[in-house]
């Protein structure tokens, strides 16, 4: 299964070519998965560069992180990223709350000083990249499944024929591209907006695995009403629940959640 996933990532998601360099980054790594990626990279004539990390160590580093330290890390990794043709990140965690006690001001500083130049300004526009999660007992627990059953489910959706899926998406993409008004209604949600002229993009296994959505965006000042999310969202180790946004002419004028102060921070 890892071998097939590695083929999907190398040959399809980032379409690595002979002589190209790929940065492989895995958190709480599975040696079998990393090995499969290295082997597949060599099989297509590419050059793998591997970085392995552990969430517990990352937490300790972040708790004492200074801005000067983050700047040095950013300088080194930005230079490395600029030499890469592709980037594969596989994120895994035994405890989804591992970073919950990292101070918010440090997290914000790290995002500004490190993530912005390395990932937002370099990786996103300059490399072929794909990001995915990796199955763990923690993820299985969230899905209320056994670890074995969750792993079977995970690999079955990650190893789909995404080329076939891409073709099946075309009719919906065409419909979205000619749509103007959208009205969403549901429990706690009554939202209207326009998508006229925005276009639609297929997510068919190139940037994220597993994949399968077709996305668009609203005309910026056309969004009005309220939207309430019925699923939790993990951000920097904190679990937001009952998130609700109220929009007026495209601007969020009210945001609430299980920790309203934190979400407005």
Residue ranges and their predicted role:
Residues 183, 242-244:
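Short, surface-exposed charged micro-motifs
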């Amino acid at each position: 299964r890892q071998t097939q996933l590695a083929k999907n990532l190398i040959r399809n998601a980032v379409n690595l070519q002979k002589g190209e360099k790929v940065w492989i980054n895995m958190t709480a790594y599975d040696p079998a998965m990393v090995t499969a990626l290295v082997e597949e990279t060599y099989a297509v004539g590419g050059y793998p560069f591997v970085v392995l990390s552990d969430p517990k160590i990352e937490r300790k580093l972040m708790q004492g992180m200074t801005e000067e330290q983050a700047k040095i890390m950013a300088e080194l990794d930005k230079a490395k990223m600029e030499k890469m043709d592709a980037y594969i990140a596989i994120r895994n965690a035994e405890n989804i709350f591992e970073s919950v006690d990292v101070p918010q001001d440090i997290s914000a500083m790290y995002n500004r000083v490190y993530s912005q130049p390395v990932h937002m300004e370099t990786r996103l526009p300059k490399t072929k990249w794909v990001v995915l999660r990796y199955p763990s007992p923690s993820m299985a627990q969230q899905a209320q499944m056994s670890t074995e059953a969750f792993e079977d489910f995970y690999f079955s959706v990650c190893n789909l024929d995404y080329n076939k899926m891409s073709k099946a998406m075309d009719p919906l993409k065409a419909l979205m591209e000619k749509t103007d008004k959208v009205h969403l209604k549901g429990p706690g949600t009554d939202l209207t907006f326009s998508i006229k002229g925005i276009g639609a993009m297929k997510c068919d296994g190139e940037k994220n695995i597993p994949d399968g959505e077709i996305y668009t965006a609203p005309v910026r000042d056309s969004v009005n009403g309220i939207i309430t999310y019925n699923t939790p969202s993990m951000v920097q180790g904190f679990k937001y629940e009952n998130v609700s946004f109220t929009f007026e002419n495209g601007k969020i004028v009210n945001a609430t959640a299980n920790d309203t102060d934190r979400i407005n921070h």
